[in-house]
């Protein structure tokens, strides 16, 4: 039988995605046996984040201010609005340094089987943001999973019906990729989405 505090820590670690009971136990043992200072740092950082982070009122990404740095920047192209599923997708788009518009972070994707509908992905806020009078194009940058595709389709239809230009990220062969190593579905999509030179 384990001490209640240890059991509580293991159960708390299980809330993380992809962490089952064995992984949670290994993490707990590591933090308690080998890295107590790291455990204190982790606890402090988590407490700080919970206290100081909230959602940007414009893009819904995490921010310490009411409006995040990207939304507040005067150097961004306010005519473009990229819709991404999660903050990690926002960060990936920023890392490319190829997009200079604004964002809206859904904090998920439509998944009726999991009980995630339009309200859970803040669709009403997205529509209001897209119709603010400055946005000319909405770029749907959701993932190419069945749920991401359904989310993009739903959002695209709603926004096109309101007169907005809507585009979707292209997909296909990765940069530097060799055709013999690309799966047939990706290659087929690349052929369908080809463009003239």
Curated annotation (Swiss-Prot):
Keywords: DNA damage, DNA recombination, DNA repair, Metal-binding, Zinc, Zinc-finger. A zinc finger (C4-type) spans 56-71. Residues 79-174 form the Toprim domain. The keyword Transcription regulation does not apply. Pfam families: RecR_C (PF21175), RecR_HhH (PF21176), RecR_ZnF (PF02132), Toprim_4 (PF13662). InterPro entries: DNA_Rcmb_RecR, Rcmb_RecR, Rcmb_RecR_Znf, TOPRIM_dom, TOPRIM_RecR. One of its GO terms (biological process) is DNA recombination. SUPFAM superfamilies: Recombination protein RecR (SSF111304). One of its GO terms (molecular function) is DNA binding. May play a role in DNA repair. It seems to be involved in an RecBC-independent recombinational process of DNA repair. It may act with RecF and RecO. Belongs to the RecR family. NCBIfam families: recR (TIGR00615). This is Recombination protein RecR.
């Amino acid at each position: 039988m384990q001490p209640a505090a240890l059991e509580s820590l293991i159960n708390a670690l299980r809330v993380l995605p992809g962490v089952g009971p064995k992984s949670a136990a290994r993490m707990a043992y590591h933090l308690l046996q080998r890295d107590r200072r790291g455990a204190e740092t982790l606890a402090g950082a988590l407490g700080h984040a919970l206290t100081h982070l909230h959602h940007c009122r414009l893009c819904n990404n995490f921010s310490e201010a009411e409006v995040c740095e990207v939304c507040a920047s005067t150097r961004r192209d306010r005519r473009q609005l990229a819709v991404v599923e999660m903050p990690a997708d926002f960060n990936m788009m920023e890392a490319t340094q190829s997009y200079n518009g604004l964002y809206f972070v859904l904090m998920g994707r439509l998944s009726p089987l999991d009980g995630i509908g339009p309200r859970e992905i803040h669709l009403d806020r997205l529509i209001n943001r897209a119709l603010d009078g400055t946005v000319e194009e909405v770029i749907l940058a959701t993932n190419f999973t069945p749920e991401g595709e359904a989310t993009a389709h739903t959002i695209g239809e709603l926004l096109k019906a309101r007169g907005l230009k809507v585009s979707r990220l292209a997909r296909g062969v990765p940069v530097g990729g060799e055709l013999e190593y690309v799966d047939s579905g990706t290659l087929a999509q690349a052929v369908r989405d080809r463009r003239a030179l």
